């Protein structure tokens, strides 16, 4: 993806506030063996770009002062309750240095799998992104995962996924985590049904234990 940024001359809280009033967002670009540079970006263009998955996970082309820079989005500061981007950080990319990034997983085909189609199960997406290590030219926007082979009682692990060339998964603790689990629909709904039946069952002892109204004393006989 490509976007345009401009060099920002004035710095400081007051200058940034005035910049936002004019519809621009302050930011910074750093790394890559060069000095950090203050920048500004059109707020509306940045707002729409942030809605795209690739803007968060891919190497971006930033045009700054007529020159193209390869950068990564590193941080976005949002206003606590307004639809306003307060500040944005980018990191320059060195073509010879490997990147440590999070890449989204795009699942597909589960509706055609035996587990979902004929065995009464659903596919539970346990993990939706993984951390990877790769060169900038090898960084994928996403990793496609085919679930059409899922069967009842099975799970899909990280080791079952073919990663793109030059991409290595980074894991912590569990070296082969579960990405997708297969859940039987009836088993998933059973606890809900039992929980709903509990108040009815509890009502029975209460009704049984309710005291009968006291009988009236017989009227005294006239002498």
Curated annotation (Swiss-Prot):
The keyword Transmembrane does not apply. InterPro entries: Rbsml_bL25/Gln-tRNA_synth_N, Ribosomal_bL25/Gln-tRNA_synth, Ribosomal_bL25_b-dom, Ribosomal_bL25_C, Ribosomal_bL25_long, Ribosomal_bL25_short, Ribosomal_L25_dom, Ribosomal_uL5_bac-type. This is Large ribosomal subunit protein bL25. It comes from Albidiferax ferrireducens (strain ATCC BAA-621 / DSM 15236 / T118). Keywords: Ribonucleoprotein, Ribosomal protein, RNA-binding, rRNA-binding. The gene is rplY. This is one of the proteins that binds to the 5S RNA in the ribosome where it forms part of the central protuberance. Part of the 50S ribosomal subunit; part of the 5S rRNA/L5/L18/L25 subcomplex. Contacts the 5S rRNA. Binds to the 5S rRNA independently of L5 and L18. GO terms for cellular component: cytosolic large ribosomal subunit. GO terms for biological process: translation. One of its GO terms (molecular function) is 5S rRNA binding. PANTHER family: RIBOSOMAL PROTEIN L25/GLN-TRNA SYNTHETASE, ANTI-CODON-BINDING DOMAIN-CONTAINING PROTEIN (PTHR33284), RIBOSOMAL PROTEIN L25_GLN-TRNA SYNTHETASE, ANTI-CODON-BINDING DOMAIN-CONTAINING PROTEIN (PTHR33284:SF1). Belongs to the bacterial ribosomal protein bL25 family. CTC subfamily.
